[in-house]
Amino acid sequence: VLSDGVSNVVYACIRMGNSDRPVDNINAGGMYSPIDLETGKIACAACDKQRIVYERHPRSGCLLKGYQIPYWDKVMDICREAAHKVPQMGYIGWDVAITKDGPLFIEANNMPGHDAFPQMPLQAPDKIGILPVFQKYIKGL
């Protein structure tokens, strides 16, 4: 959210494939998990659109909570910088891929997470969701 000339990251999540299909889209069988903004670690279990919660990735067996997202500081930096390139949008969701050489933008979304993230309280430790975070910045839009 770009509010009063300052770029603020409201939330971040990782999307992951959850089937034999090589896609991470929530609407195509994928799942997601929130990322701790300070540490860049996966904050809790993942959830799919059917509201099934996964402590471990079903294909790899990797424990999700606590997994460190590579290049996290760089991810945050490029998203904050990019928000200033399109200040007229105010609220943008940045899709970022993590490659072996660092983060790369995939796309920007003007309606990010509108169909998936209402589920977030299901697996979030506080069971609250992200509305309180949005409320801090919405006045500046």
Walk through the language-model features, giving the residues of each:
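Phosphate-binding site of ATP-dependent enzymes
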Residues: V1-D48
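Residue-level preference for alpha-helix termini and adjacent loops
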Residues: R15, P34, K41, G66, ...
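A short local loop/turn or secondary-structure capping micro-motif enriched for an aromatic residue
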Residues: G17-R21, I52-V53, G113-A116
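Extracytoplasmic/periplasmic proteins that interact with beta-lactams or build/remodel peptidoglycan
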Residues: G40-H57, G61-C62
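C-terminal active-site "lid" helix and adjoining low-complexity regulatory extension at the edge
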Residues: E55-K74, R80, H84-M89, I98-L141
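Short, surface-exposed charged micro-motifs
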Residues: G93-D95
